[in-house]
């Protein structure tokens, strides 16, 4: 998995994408099989790259910093290392970055205190619509603002220990708590704007560590954010994590889908 890690080199590789950065969900638990039917696995040239969210039969919402020159999409997956009869493979016919996302950030070796990493969103159009099944479903866009203190969770595939490069294979879940952006602002020198959400571990329940970029943040049962960035220290249960807030971007999401479907 990839994650926009603020203390690592963010220079572009030859493909025009961020270099692959391994990620972990530490101290969480294995999600119940197919309990997150909107969960998408975004691949680049046959390798797992990012998470994503199925928001329309033919559209996936993910993080802009997951940009690459080639995408493949898997839906209906739980264990990425096994063949599953619920799985659906899709090619991507086009990609659309949020026009407000600052692409120059991806060319920087280091991020600076004045950098604004808001609007970290990208829509991927599938070449063919997904088949909606028990294991593949759309996640509704939010209709209400999230509340501070909400119980949230996110999910993703990746490493589950700070001491190994072995992936979990199975989809992992972790519980978080939504907190004020001011708390993240004290932890991070980069700009915390009204376009992002800040969450931290709930009762030391686990860590997304380097995270699962592009995955959904679900708060009190409502889709509210897309996993975006944080620092790289793993299993630090004092860490705060930043998610792109979906509500302010609804107009762009809906218009992009309508105009390009």
Curated annotation (Swiss-Prot):
Reaction catalysed by this enzyme:
Preferential cleavage of Arg-|-Xaa bonds in small molecule substrates. Highly selective action to release kallidin (lysyl-bradykinin) from kininogen involves hydrolysis of Met-|-Xaa or Leu-|-Xaa
Where does the entry say this protein is expressed, by tissue?
A: Detected in prostate and semen.
What's the superkingdom here? Eukaryota
- Signal peptide: which range, if any? 1-17
Q: What is its main location?
A: secreted
Q: What is its EC number?
A: 3.4.21.35
What keywords is this UniProt entry annotated with?
Disulfide bond, Glycoprotein, Hydrolase, Protease, Secreted, Serine protease, Signal, Zymogen
Q: Which Gene3D superfamilies match?
A: Trypsin-like serine proteases
Q: Which PROSITE patterns match?
A: TRYPSIN_DOM, TRYPSIN_HIS, TRYPSIN_SER
Q: Which residues form the propeptide?
A: 18-24
GO cellular component annotations, sorted alphabetically? Answer: extracellular space; secretory granule
Q: Where are glycans found on this sequence?
A: 79
Q: Where is the active site?
A: 65, 120, 213
Q: Please report which protein family the annotation says this sequence is part of.
A: Belongs to the peptidase S1 family. Kallikrein subfamily.
Instruction: Read off the PANTHER family from this record.
Output: KALLIKREIN-1, KALLIKREIN-RELATED
Role summary:
Glandular kallikreins cleave Met-Lys and Arg-Ser bonds in kininogen to release Lys-bradykinin.
* Name used for this protein in its record: Kallikrein-1E2
Organism per entry:
Equus caballus
């Amino acid at each position: 998995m990839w994650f926009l890690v603020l203390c690592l080199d963010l220079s572009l590789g030859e493909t025009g994408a961020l270099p692959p950065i391994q990620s972990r969900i530490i101290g969480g638990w294995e999600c119940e099989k197919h309990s997150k039917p909107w969960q998408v696995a975004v691949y680049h040239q046959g390798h797992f790259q990012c998470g994503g969210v199925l928001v329309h039969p033919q559209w996936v919402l993910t993080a802009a910093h997951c940009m690459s020159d080639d995408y493949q999409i898997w839906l209906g997956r739980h264990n990425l290392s096994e063949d599953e009869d619920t799985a659906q493979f899709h090619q991507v016919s086009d990609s659309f970055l949020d026009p407000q996302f600052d692409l120059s950030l991806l060319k920087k070796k280091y991020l600076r205190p004045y950098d604004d990493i808001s609007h970290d969103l990208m829509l991927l159009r599938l070449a063919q619509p997904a088949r909606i099944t028990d294991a593949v479903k759309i996640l509704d866009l939010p209709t209400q603002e999230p509340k501070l203190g909400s119980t949230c969770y996110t999910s993703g595939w990746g490493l589950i220990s700070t001491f190994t490069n072995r992936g979990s294979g199975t989809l992992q879940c972790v519980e978080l708590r939504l907190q004020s952006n001011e708390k993240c602002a004290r932890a991070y020198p980069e700009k915390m704007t009204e376009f992002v959400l800040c969450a931290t571990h709930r009762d030391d329940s686990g860590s997304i560590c380097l995270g699962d970029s592009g995955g959904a943040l679900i708060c009190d049962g409502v889709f509210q954010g897309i996993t975006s960035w944080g620092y790289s220290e793993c299993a630090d249960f004092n860490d705060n994590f930043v998610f792109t807030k979906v509500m302010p971007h609804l107009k762009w999401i809906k218009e992009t889908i309508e105009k390009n479907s």
